[in-house]
Amino acid sequence: MSGKINILMLGGAKRVSLAKIFKSAGERMGKGVEIFSYEIIPSVPIACVGTVLDGSRWGDADIYDKIAKVIKEKEINIILPFVDGAIEICSKLKELHPDVFIPVSDFAVAHSMFDKVEAAAVFESHHFEIP
């Protein structure tokens, strides 16, 4: 990784504080941190600390191609999901872009955990108590 770290955030709230923390940590490490956020609405608070990119809905057929283009054009090093729907997207992106750090589980686990009934069945099969 060079002297610059580019982070792509996918959806969600409360990202401004985290973006500021990432930038501060980058400064301490002697690296510039640039924040990008993939949005369907351009006027979001993250715009005060990063660049808002025109995004697609999670269910759009071409979302992987569009994010792949962002990864290449913006030289993205890290992708972080901030909403449940983005976790499954990120698990697929992790398979498609192994050079990008994407801290999510594999698609099967992400998919199971997104569905509460399916998640409960997985927990029960491993003898976890479910409240």
Segments from the language model and where they lie:
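ATP-binding N-terminal substructure of ATP-dependent carboxylate-amine bond-forming enzymes
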Residues: 1-106
